[in-house]
Regions:
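Non-catalytic, C-terminal membrane-associated alpha-helical segments of glycosyltransferases
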Residues: 200-203, 217-271
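Acidic donor-binding loop at a coil-to-helix junction in glycosyltransferase catalytic cores
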Residues: 157-165
Length: 271
C-alpha cells in the first residue's frame, strides 16, 4: 500500500530515534499510513542537498514531508493538518520555533538570534514573502514537484540550499502555502560551532553569489557598498576588529548587530 506520507529525515551524526517514534505514534493516532526514511550522511558524505535528493528518490509516497533531525514534536503538531493543507498547494511550510529556555548554555548567541527570528515566524508573516521565508526544517512537498526541482547539489556544505529551492519555486510559479504547524528546533550548537557554520555559510554565499543574487539581504547590502566604494574600508576595519568582534559573539552578552557586522566583514574578505 502506498503511504499517505513519506517522511524524510536527513541526518548527520545525530540520534533522531525519539523523533521517529513520535512521528510514527502521531501517524497512528491520526490514522495515516507513513513511510519514515532517515538518511544518515555521517559515512556517505553526500552533502546536504544530495542527501535530501536521494531520500526523495527512495520515497514511495505521493507527498514528502522533510523534517530536520534535531526537531522535537510539540503536542499541537499534526500530520493530518499537513495532509489537509496539501489540498491547497503543492508546497506547504509548517514553521518552527524554539523553546523558552535555552537548551544549550553554550549557545547564547544562537539562542538569542533564533528567539528574535521566532517573533516573525508565524504563518501570517511568512506568507508576506512566501518564497524568501521557505524553510525545509519542516516542509511538505508533492513528490513530483520535488523531483522536478530538487535541491541544488552545488550546496555541499552548510547554508542556502533552502534559499535556492525557494528561488526555483518562485521562478517556476509554484505556489507555497505557509501554515502554523511548527516543530521545535532543539539542536542548538555551542556558539563556537555556530560561528564556524556561519563562516561556512558565507563561503557558500560567496561561491554561489550569482545564483543567489536577488535572494540575499547580505548580497544586497554588499552591492550598495560596492556602489559607494566602501568595501575596502570595511575590510580594513573588520580585519582590525575581528578579535574583539569574536570575543563579543562568543561571550555572555553577544550583540546581534555585531553578528551582522561580523558576517558582512567576513564575506567581504573572501577571495
Amino acid at each position: 500500500m502506498t503511504p499517505t506520507l513519506s517522511i524524510l529525515i536527513p541526518c548527520f551524526d545525530y540520534d533522531c530515534s525519539k523523533l521517529v517514534a513520535d512521528l510514527q505514534r502521531k501517524g497512528d493516532e491520526e490514522g495515516l499510513s507513513l513511510e519514515i526514511i532517515v538518511g544518515d550522511d555521517t559515512l556517505t558524505r553526500l552533502g546536504r542537498a544530495r542527501n535530501r535528493n536521494r531520500l526523495a528518490e527512495q520515497a514511495s509516497g505521493e507527498w514528502l514531508l522533510i523534517v530536520d533531525c534535531d526537531a522535537a514534536m510539540p503536542p499541537a503538531f499534526s500530520l493530518r493538518k499537513y495532509v489537509e493543507a496539501g489540498r491547497q498547494a503543492p508546497v506547504v511550510c509548517g514553521g518552527l520555533y524554539h523553546p523558552d529556555v535555552n537548551p544549550c548554555p553554550e549557545a547564547t548567541l544562537r539562542f538569542k538570534y533564533e528567539r528574535k527570528a521566532d517573533l516573525r515566524r508565524a504563518a501570517r508573516f511568512r506568507q508576506e514573502h512566501p518564497y524568501a521565508q521557505l524553510s525545509t526544517f519542516s516542509l511538505l512537498v508533492r513528490r513530483e514537484t520535488f523531483l522536478a526541482i530538487r535541491f541544488d547539489e552545488a550546496c555541499v556544505e552548510y547554508g542556502y540550499e533552502d534559499t535556492l529551492f525557494g528561488a526555483e519555486l518562485e521562478r517556476r510559479g509554484i505556489p507555497i502555502l505557509h501554515i502554523d504547524n511548527p516543530l521545535i528546533h532543539m539542536g542548538l550548537e555551542p556558539d563556537a560551532i555556530f560561528l564556524a557554520k556561519t563562516e561556512t555559510a558565507m563561503r557558500t554565499l560567496h561561491r554561489l553569489e550569482q545564483k543567489l543574487r536577488g535572494h540575499s539581504h547580505l548580497l544586497a547590502t554588499v552591492d550598495r557598498l560596492r556602489r559607494l566604494h566602501l568595501c575596502g574600508l570595511i575590510r580594513c576595519c573588520w580585519r582590525l576588529c575581528r578579535k574583539p568582534l569574536r570575543a563579543n559573539l562568543l561571550g555572555k552578552h553577544p550583540s546581534l548587530f555585531l553578528f551582522s557586522v561580523y558576517k558582512l566583514g567576513f564575506f567581504l574578505c573572501l577571495r
